[in-house]
Each structure stands twice: as structure tokens, then as C-alpha cells.
Amino acid sequence: MTTRLSGTTSLRPIRFGFLVRPSDKKSVSRIMRWSTCLWGGRCNPIIPVGRYPAHWRSSEPFLRKPDREVARDYMRFFEPDIIVEAEPGLAESIGFDAVSNSSLESQLISLDELHSKKWTGHRMDLYVGQSVVDIYQADYEARHQFVLREDVPALLFKEDRLAPLVEAIFGAFPRDEDADYFKKFYENAYSPKLAAAGPDTWLSVFEGKAKPPFYPTFLDLEIEPKTRREATFFIFDHTKTSDLIDYWNTRLFETPVFPVPLCWLDELKGFVSKAINSNHRPIPNNSFGTMFTSQVVFARSVKEEVAKAVVEVFSSDCPDGSFFIGRSTHPKHTDDWHGPRCARHSVKSDEARLSLEVEGGSVSFPMPYPKFAERFGGGRYRWANVVNLSAHGPSDMALCYPSNIEDRTFPHLAMGQQGPIVSREGWVLLEHYHESSGYLRIDSGTDAICRWLKKKGIEAKPSSAGRIASQMVEKLASLRAADLIADKDTIQILNKMAMQERTSNSKSTSNTKTFEGRTADTGRWHELIKKRAKNTLRFRVSLEQFTSRGILKLGLGLNCPHCTHSNWYGLDGVDYIVTCERCLKEFSYPQGSKEPRWKYRVTGPFSVPNFAEGAYAVTLTLATFAKSLSPVGDIGMTMTTGLNLKCDAFEREIDFAFWYRKERMLDQKGEPHFVVGEAKSFAEEAIEKGDLEALQVVAKELPGTVLVVSVLKEKFSEKEKRLLEKLVRWGWVSVEGRMRAPVIMLTGVELFADWTVEKSWQQKGAPYPADADRSVFSDLELFALETQRIHLGIDYYDELRKRRRT
């Protein structure tokens, strides 16, 4: 069967992450100047590494982190493609030295290497990144070649004591040796007016009456903000390097941001007040009369008394509630629980939709490129394509991976290319010439997770039970048809057929017992399907679906006249003369008798006894996460069934594992959770101490792993609850600001859910919540806490409050 994938590939500039010490004024200046020479250069973050100034540290004790961890937060938030160090060792100091792997040398470079002499040709060029020189040429040819003067003039700024303001706000060219050609090309293309930095020039730029040097870096870019604010006015001291870094980065997650230097405040306060008043208007179609508001953000170096004085100046001309006041913050992505969170802007230039066939375990596709760029440039990588692929419904293909920003040696999926870089944005491929094609290997979920565990020092191989469950998942179209078995009675009859249960032969005086031969009368199945049709709201089952999936096979039942064994013959095995399966004697088919009966026989993994060695519970648990938590199909999930795990610390078996990510609409994706679990059937004491110890040792080796314990029965026994509570409380312990191991508990209530887990809870009644918050079903940690409250009657937040009181 051909497997098809759909998705997109989006063109954008390479995202550089410039690592620099907050006190290194000279390097910050160079970074800002080189950003004026890069396509999308002002979309690149400046990541402070090293000792932070005191005013950058949070006044809230619970938000305080070591400077190194804050720098790592910057990296996780911005997810740079290329890391540029202002001095050697900065990446290593924050744990990103793996990016310096020799096979990845171009993804970690020094600031001096950015403009390299390695490349020979008709002129110098950037070692990495798309140069603005191509933009100048294309822009000139498209707009200026036959026009003596542009309506909106370009500017070029004088070099003076206000150079830091020019670099941060307007753009300036590098002072580096052999880099003066950028300025010359700019002058030739735009004939700019020489200007001095000042309030008047600021007004002309932000009122759209002049274009500064950074303007061409945005050619053909669409920048989509993820925050919904009308305006942000960033007030800072340009003599403080930390303030310049704060302003530079704030632009990348707030919009629009107007920089207001304290030295120009008196001249610009009229513009600010007018803009705040203009923004303060009713939100359309809002019945509550809510108004748009602006925000005034102060850099953290600005003293409190200065900030109060500035607010008084604005307040005198602005109505109450027209703006609110804040302080600049270190950015943290939305997966971080602690403190304010934000989302960086989406940047792209072009996008192509993909519809692909997986052939030989791989896909290929054309990728967009910037039309203004020369076909072959000097740099090794000039732009990026971000690929997002999805299957139609649940799939056994590995399309969801954890980010590899720190160590890019896994996964290696780009055939003949380096990468991809896996981020919350997608799979990032770095390109350097026109009309190139992308080639990606598509692994199975089992292969992907086993390779990832090997990188973590854990050998993983499919277990015997895991192979059975894998076959079941495959038969059910990678969980898309899991609803067929999401019924207690259906599983019970399938298991009874698989067990070959002995039944009494009431017609025999000797009371002999015979094997049923893994069969059941068709009438019994028709009754079951009729019953399910009355009780279900979503999935209409039919016997045709069971036979087409290879679960059941139709045939005829016939007793042997020699040994009375109950035989079953498939439609291709019926003849005038048939052979008994037991005694191997032939006998004539009874053509005139009523004895032959139509029967179904269970086949494949469904014919394995003992509830298919737990495969039903595993399959339905995976289906619950893939479908029933979020029925609209916005889940990213890469899964595997049972594995045998072995490392120096332990040797254990787990029933399933998967990466799970709730996709976000119009947003970067979240970081996927790694989930492992144990799945049991209907036994009264199904969960044993050893099962939970297996999960615990995995979580010790991989902190943050989500643990799942599921059973097909509706309730855990009291003994099981005591064991589970110990595991839950162990998992509550904080490691690096997060729970060590959130524990999710599922029963038949969730696994047999007719529509969604939420609906099933509502129908079941107490202790299940009737109105659980929607966030419970989109965040695995919150979902874990809710299942703990339901099944164990313990509440994580109540426990925290008790600890604080004591």
C-alpha cells in the first residue's frame, strides 16, 4: 500500500544565534553591523552568555536561575540554525559544544569567520548566510534603474558618538577590513542621503518618510507576530550594552516595537502619547467594551524613579487604562511553566505545499529559494527551508522528533545533506543554491525511538509482546481503525476464540470436551455488531471491517465423523472430500445435512491467547493518545510497541513508548514529551510492583519522561492504588524546575471512550470531572494530575500548599 504524506516547505533566511558576553560592547556593535549585511539579519537574536549584570537577575526568588540556565533558555527559545561565537568557548560554556562536531563545523563558527576569505571568486562573500549585495542588485534592477529618485529616500548615517543607537535602531555597516564593499553597493543602489542620528531622523523613519540601511534586509519577508499587541514602546539607555541587547531581542517576540532612547524622550514623547491614544479604541465586535491597549516597557537598567517620572509624562496626555507598564524579560518558550512566557515571530519568504509518496522509505521534493539570489553564492549555506510533514491520521512513521538544537547528530534524515535541524518550527534544511531538492528518510517509529535511546546509552530491541502488538497496530491501519476493538465485549469474544476454550459436548454420554478451533458462530458476531450499533455515537462498525482487516475469517464448521473433532474450513478449503485437522482422516462433505454452520475464525495477532499478550491494552492506550485526547487530529506522535531496554543501570521491558506533541494552531509547536508505559488487561491485580519499578528506572535515566499505567478494567484495586501512589509521589519531585516523572493512569473508561476522553468522563460521573478545563487534554502534565485526582484522590497542588504552610 502506498503511503502518502502532506505538508509544507517554507523558505526563510538562516537564523543566526550570536553568542556574546553582555559586557562585550565591541562585539555587540560588530554583531549589529553584520546583521545589516544579512538577509533577515535583524531577525537574528543576540544571546548573552557569561556573567549577567545585577539588574538582569529576577527580584522574584522562585524565578531566579543561574546565568548559564538563562542563556540556555535563550537558545531553546530562539533555536538558531547557525551559532556564531564572539569569542571561543561560549557555546561550550552553556552545553552546546556538541554542535562543534567536526561533521557540523559550519553550524558553529566564530564572528571573525562570518565574513570569510576561504571562498575564491569575483568578490568576497559571507561564509554563511545570504548577502544583502544580491538584494541591492535585484532591488536596483527592479525599482531604481530607470528612476532618478525614489519617493521615500534611503538614509546613510554619520559615524559619531551615537553609533550604538544607529546600529541598534537604523542599521550601520561593518568596520571590519575588506567589508567596505557592502556600504559601497548600498550607496550605488540607493543613492542614500547622509543623515545624523537624532529625534527628527527617528520620526522620519518610523513615520515611513525615510528608509534606513536595515530596510533591504527584509526583502520578500513575511513576519507574523505571535503576540497580539497594538504597540510596544521600549524605553532604554543606549549607553548600556545590556539595554541594547534587550531591545534587539524584544523586537523578535513583541510587535510593533518602537525604540525610545532616554536621551530623546523629551522630543519623542509627543509621538508616543499620540500613538497610545490612537491605539486606545474599542475592539471590534466586543460586547464588553474592551479597548486596545499599548504597553510601555522599560529596560531593566532604568531605575524605578526614572521609570515613574516617564510614566507621569505619558499619563498626563493619555486616558486611564490606555497603556500598561512592564519591564523587559529574558524570553522563555511556552513549554516553560515558570515566569512570563512568549513566542517568537514567524519569519518566512515563500511556501510550497507538498503531497508526497513514500518510496523506499524516503521522500523527495523541490524547495523554494529566494529569486533575488545568485544561483551559486560564495557561502556554504545561504538560506533555510523548514519542512513540516504529516500523515492522514495516526501513523507508524516517525514524523515527530524531539528538538536537536544541542546535539544535531540525531536524527540524520537528510539523504546526501546535513541535518535536518529539528526544532519546534519543523525540520530545517540549510541550502546554498537554486532549484535544489530535499531528500528525507522516513523511519518507522520503532527504529527512530531505538536510535534515540541508543544515543542516550540505552540499547533497545522489540520484545516478543511488542512484536505482537506491532502486528495488531498494523492490522488496524496504524490505529486509524482501533475503534473496531474499543469495546469490552468485542475483546472478550476475540480472546475467548483465541484461547480455544474447552466446552462440554452435551450430546456425548461420556461428557467429552472438544476444542472450538478459534471459531465462533456468525450469529454471535451479528448480535454483537447490532448491540454496538445501538450504543455507539461515533464509529459504525460492521463485520466487513473485521474481515477486511484480517481480524476474522469466514468459513464453515464441521464435526469429523471419525473422532468428533470440530473442524473449521476456510472458503478455499471446502471440497467434496475434506480432511480432519486432528485425525487426518478423509470424509465426505455432508451435502444434505444441516450440520455445517458458518463460523468466523480469529486470525493473525488476534489469535494469540491471553488478550494477545497484552496487545489489546497497548493498542487502545496508544489510540487514546493519538485520537481520543484531541479528536481534531492536531497531534504529533511517533510510537513504538514493547521494547527490551538494557543499559549499565538496568535491564527492563516496557510495553510501549512514544513522543507526543500537541500541535498549536498558528504557532511554533511545543517540545514533544517522551512517554513510556505499562498496559494490562482485566486481571483483578494486574499491576505489580515490578511493573512500576521498570517505569521508575527508565524515568531515573531519562528525567522528565511521562509514565503511563493503563488497564482495560474500569477500576484499580486498592493494592494497585497503594503501589501507584508511591510512584506518583516519587514523580512529583522537581528536577530542573519540572516534575521528575508525571504519571498518567488510564482505565477502560478512557480506553473504551466512545468519542473523547472528555465525553467519557462527563458520562461516567463522579469522581470523573463533568467540566474539566480544556487545557487538561492538551497538556500531558495537567492530564496526569487530573487522572491522579480521579483514581487516587490526591491533588498535587494541595500537597504543595500544605508544604508551604508547614
Predicted segment positions?
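Intrinsically disordered, low-complexity Ser/Thr/Pro/Gly-rich regulatory segments
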Residues: 1-243, 248-806
